[in-house]
Amino acid sequence: MPRILIADDEDSMRMLVARAIAMDGHDTMTAADGAEALDLLTREQGRFDLLLTDIQMPVMDGIALALAAARDFPDLKILLMTGYADQRERASGLNAIVHDVVTKPFTVADIRTAVADALAARKG
């Protein structure tokens, strides 16, 4: 069963995404910001199959989190989420470490498909 770490500062979004991907049998952990997510990644020694993170968050944003996660855990697959076009553009320079950017709002089916695609893809 794939382990997925979800980072989003919006409680409702974290819960929605966690429930949606749990429907496919994935084991999820959640974090309210990038710093908390990085702490979980470190504590769990990177033992996640996917990091699914919002870009715009307090304390540490999703791009800083993605860069730190890719540096410390190069085999970790990363999927970003954003509701802002300018944030999506910021993420475009991260193609080497990020599988995709999912645009909010999305449906349950959209996020389940994006997660399945990311998990099925080869890293690098």
Listing of model-derived features with the role each one plays in the protein:
Residues 33-36, 61-65:
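Acidic catalytic/metal-coordinating carboxylates
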Residues 53-54:
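Active-site T/S-Asp motif of two-component receiver
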Residues 62, 93-102:
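As written
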